[in-house]
Amino acid sequence: MTHPEREAGGMMTTSYLSFPPSTTVKETLEKFRQEAANVDLVYYVYVTDDEERLLGVVTLRDLILADQDKKLEELMDERVISVKLDDKEDTIAEHFAKYAVTAIPVVDENERMQGTIMFKNLLEVVAPHLGQ
């Protein structure tokens, strides 16, 4: 399904890293190294259940500094800011401004991960329309 360019679904990339909550830091970093070339810029790893429902987020900084044997469920922040597939650019821009994040996960109506929007993706869509 294609989404309009000025909605979250049209701005998102489907290139992101997600892991089950029981994954260790060591396992996450190993997978990150394997997948790094295939993934856009990574600021966060997303913690999802077996149906890809978004449970939490771990910053790359927290991941690097954590004990290798810790599980993501011990590190994750459950207060995840997300947008829906059909959210418009103004809502997305407000989220970036209000929460000072570098990427926002995009979820469907069942809270399942669909992709992420990086701030640069928002700018690419909004910049051509500034001053109109």
Locations of regions flagged by a protein language model:
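Cytosolic regulatory modules rich in charged/polar residues
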Residues: M1-Q132
